[in-house]
Amino acid sequence: MKYTVDTHTHTVASTHAYSTIHDYLPIAKAKGIKLFATTDHGPDMADAPHFWHFVNLHVLPRVVDGVGILRGIEANIKNIDGEIDFPERYESRLDMIMAGFHEPVFPPCDQATHTQAMINAIKSGRVDMISHPGNPAFPIDIQAVVKAAAEYRVALELNNSSFSHSRPGSEGNCRAIVEAARDMGAYLTFGSDSHVAFSLGDFEHCHRLVTEAGFPAERILARSPRALLDFLESRGRAHIPEFADL
């Protein structure tokens, strides 16, 4: 299967990343990526952009040379209540919100706390997808989290970089998440988690896991722009007419 959507990328606005949005566009074109989300880290990360960066994403064109750009954020889950580090009053400025755990904001503790925090973020209604839920630094009750994600229609990310360099030891957890999502009716999204444009759309490990698990293609949001956009609209996000022809 050809995947044409990447929901997780970073730019130089997160200063441990090395590409601009402009850098991503020719790579997207060359790789057949029709839609990607710019999702820099939420403001509570030490080197993240100020929240004005996200508020001002409306200056970006919707489509450049046939490639769509979604305005997003990888917010931080801050506490056991599932709160995130982006002001709710500005949420309408974004097309999507991804949220996850990052050690500088939420120090790892115990499985019960991680699980409750993630489930509360899912239940909050503010989060469209959970980033790298298979991170072994933050063990969770996978069955409980996937059940909540299915019930509240929040996508779970398969993060391709988790299998290579970012979060060693993730594969077993990710496999269990895929299998639970398959059985419980949850949605998956694929993220390259690119911190440099060259890795945009790299999903080889994600594809391998869903293929081995027999995960249904119709619940993989990376398969087409329409699949992702319909999912976001079903969660109450705004219709984006400029993406009609992607």
Curated annotation (Swiss-Prot):
Q: Name one GO biological process term.
A: bacterial-type flagellum-dependent swarming motility
Q: Which Pfam families match?
A: PHP
Annotated SMART domains: POLIIIAc
Q: Which residues bind Zn(2+) 2?
A: H16, H41, H195
Record: residues binding Zn(2+) 1:
H8, H10, E74, D193
Sorted alphabetically, the Gene Ontology cellular component annotations on this record are: cytosol
Cofactor note (record): Binds 3 Zn(2+) ions per subunit.
**What SUPFAM superfamilies does this protein map onto?**
PHP domain-like
Family affiliation: Belongs to the PHP family.
Q: What is this protein called?
A: Probable phosphatase AHA_1344
Look up and give the organism this protein is from: Aeromonas hydrophila subsp. hydrophila (strain ATCC 7966 / DSM 30187 / BCRC 13018 / CCUG 14551 / JCM 1027 / KCTC 2358 / NCIMB 9240 / NCTC 8049)
